[in-house]
């Protein structure tokens, strides 16, 4: 079974931990640690589009809006499980700092 068929069998998200406009941090992958604002939540595919993260180059055909066409850079989707709310991320980092300080003292 290929990846596309697998993702289509999932049920759409009923409740999402992140909403459009939220500040999120990427927690895994090549963009790990980067922050951005959620532009769109794709509930059916369990993915999000985050501003300035995972930029890809896309060939665009000439149209009335863009008579020249060419190559455009835009955001690609990221699995919703690979992002975390920035506020939650900061709390987690604070806990780690406290644990390290206690370990160094004792």
Swiss-Prot record:
GO terms for molecular function: rRNA binding; structural constituent of ribosome. NCBIfam families: rplX_bact (TIGR01079). Part of the 50S ribosomal subunit. CDD domains: KOW_RPL26 (cd06089). One of two assembly initiator proteins, it binds directly to the 5'-end of the 23S rRNA, where it nucleates assembly of the 50S subunit. One of the proteins that surrounds the polypeptide exit tunnel on the outside of the subunit. Residues 1-20 are annotated as: Disordered. Disulfide bonds: none annotated. It holds the Pfam family ribosomal_L24. InterPro entries: KOW (IPR005824), Rib_uL2_dom2 (IPR014722), Ribosomal_uL24 (IPR003256), Ribosomal_uL24_CS (IPR005825), Ribosomal_uL24_KOW (IPR041988), Translation_prot_SH3-like_sf (IPR008991). It comes from the Bacteria. Keywords: Ribonucleoprotein, Ribosomal protein, RNA-binding, rRNA-binding. This is Large ribosomal subunit protein uL24. GO terms for biological process: translation. Belongs to the universal ribosomal protein uL24 family. GO terms for cellular component: ribonucleoprotein complex; ribosome. Residues 8-20 have a biased composition (Basic and acidic residues).
């Amino acid at each position: 079974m290929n990846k596309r068929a697998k993702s289509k069998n999932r049920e759409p998200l009923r409740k999402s931990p992140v909403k459009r406009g939220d500040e999120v941090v990427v927690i895994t992958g090549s963009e790990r640690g980067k922050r951005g604002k959620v532009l769109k939540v794709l509930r059916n595919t369990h993915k999000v589009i985050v501003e300035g993260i995972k930029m890809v180059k896309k060939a665009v055909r000439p149209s009335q809006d863009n008579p020249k066409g060419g190559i455009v850079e835009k955001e690609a989707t990221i699995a919703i499980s690979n992002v975390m709310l920035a506020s939650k991320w900061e709390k987690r980092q604070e806990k780690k700092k406290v644990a390290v300080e206690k370990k160094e003292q004792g």
